[in-house]
């Protein structure tokens, strides 16, 4: 008998992955956490039935949410990561010798526990001396911060359920206040393809654009995410994501990546016409 995991992208569309076995399942105080072993994508983490990562394509998301801002802000040393309990963002950040502090704020300790046990390739740098983990509500945490961080990475789940508060105008305003005078915030903005996701993306972008003087959207292609097409937000007090990219300095780090390159960095901000139109709709109102 075959066992398949299916995630509904809309009521009429679902994405299915054949499963060899279920490795972990637990209902935490916040969400259901499952980890599956699959023949095609390796181990797969889901939260409340939504794919958060697979071993096969996780590098795409983590490299794009980390290396894009790090290649622009060459002096980023103090970094706040919100969400990202799987450890992938931390793994990429610890590759930079200049980073002095990584504060990770994760709501659900069970996510960290599960990923340490079953996804060691993701959680392998969570014990780095520069990493400080705080299990608390990110909204409450960020309100206490003022001009403290060079970079904030918001690696939340989708803007529904437990993470809904991380897509509000209040939250983005708190992030602005928590950044130093040349700080950058990046966040995942979901897929623009299906109607519900597209509306959530537009709301998020409108709120960010009204908060930060520089606000852009960039893209990546992630096979196991909705429609295989994913967006990130880049918001900054000072730096432009393309004009202030120092490609030669980043290349000099000799950092091996599987997805990110400085050429791709530039190309990721060149968006298809339908998406440019969607963004203009909210920027002009």
Where does each model-flagged region fall?
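SAM/dcSAM-binding transferase cores
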Residues: 1-34, 227-285
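N-terminal accessory segments
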Residues: 1-52, 57-63, 67-70, 74
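The AdoMet/dcAdoMet-binding core of the Class I SAM-like
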Residues: 2-4, 28, 53-182, 194-201, ...
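Glycine- and acidic
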Residues: 50, 189-190
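Alpha-helical structural signal in soluble globular domains
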Residues: 92, 96, 207-211, 237
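Conserved Class I S-adenosyl-L-methionine
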Residues: 172-173, 198-219, 233
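Conserved beta-strand signature within the Rossmann-like core of class I S-adenosyl-L-methionine
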Residues: 182-189
């Amino acid at each position: 008998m075959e066992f398949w995991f299916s995630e509904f992208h809309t009521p009429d569309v679902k994405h299915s992955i054949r499963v060899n076995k279920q490795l972990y399942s637990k209902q935490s105080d916040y969400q259901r956490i499952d980890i599956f072993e699959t023949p095609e994508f390796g181990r797969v983490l889901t939260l409340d039935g939504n794919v958060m990562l697979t071993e096969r394509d996780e590098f795409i998301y983590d490299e794009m949410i980390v290396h894009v801002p790090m290649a622009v802000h060459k002096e980023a040393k103090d970094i706040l990561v919100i969400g990202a309990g799987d450890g992938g963002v931390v793994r990429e950040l610890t590759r930079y010798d200049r980073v002095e502090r990584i504060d990770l704020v994760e709501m659900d300790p069970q996510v960290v526990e599960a990923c340490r046990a079953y996804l060691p390739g993701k959680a392998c740098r969570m014990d780095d001396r520069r990493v400080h983990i705080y299990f608390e509500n990110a909204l409450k945490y960020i309100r206490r911060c003022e001009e403290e961080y060079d970079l904030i990475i918001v690696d939340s789940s989708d803007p529904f359920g437990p993470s809904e508060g991380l897509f509000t105008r209040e939250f983005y305003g708190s992030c602005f206040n928590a950044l130093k005078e040349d700080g950058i915030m990046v966040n995942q903005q979901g897929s623009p393809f299906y109607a519900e996701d597209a509306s959530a993306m537009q709301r998020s972008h409108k709120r960010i654009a009204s908060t930060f003087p520089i606000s852009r959207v960039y893209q990546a292609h992630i096979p196991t995410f909705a429609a295989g097409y994913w967006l990130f937000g880049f918001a900054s007090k000072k730096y432009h994501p393309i004009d202030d990219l120092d490609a030669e300095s980043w290349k000099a780090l000799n950092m091996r990546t599987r997805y990110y390159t400085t050429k791709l960095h530039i190309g990721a901000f060149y968006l298809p016409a339908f998406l440019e139109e969607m963004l203009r709709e909210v920027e002009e109102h």
